[in-house]
Amino acid sequence: MARRVVFLDIDGVLAPIRRWDRYGDLDPACIRVLNEIVAGAGAAVVVSSTWRHGKTVTELQEMLEAAGFIGCVIDKTPVGAPGADRGEEIAAWLAEHPVGGYVIIDDHADMGELRTRLVLTQPARGLQPADAPRAIEILKRAAG
């Protein structure tokens, strides 16, 4: 069976933005919810956040592990053409990598046709325990 994948944004998801003059720090409570999701669905993470710029997959894994993440970062989405939205970057990754199921966890809704797979977070709160069941349910749905 093909792998299940969480496309992960970081700002506004794992790093709540509580002040608009600076980005947030990784929140251990949000990381725990992510751990519940990846464990509950047997999923791996593909980083779709701007945090992927200038970092290797190994560096992203180490950064998340240092904050308590217990899962596996397997890749990061490609950087799209100028003006491309996140949904287009995720679609490009999916075109090259078959998956059994996927969910997008982001605080922006610019996912185009992929929005039925989106768990939208509130930027000031980040990923919440109430988001986990829906994310797991979406992950367990066949891709397509």
Model-derived regions: residue spans:
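Residue-level detector of intrinsically disordered, flexible termini
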Residues: 1, 40-42, 134, 141-142
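Alpha-helical hydrophobic/aromatic positions enriched in membrane-embedded helices and signal peptides
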Residues: 1-3, 98-99
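Alpha-helical substrate-recognition element adjacent to the catalytic core
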Residues: 2-83
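C-terminal cap/substrate-recognition subdomain and adjoining C-terminal extension
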Residues: 58-144
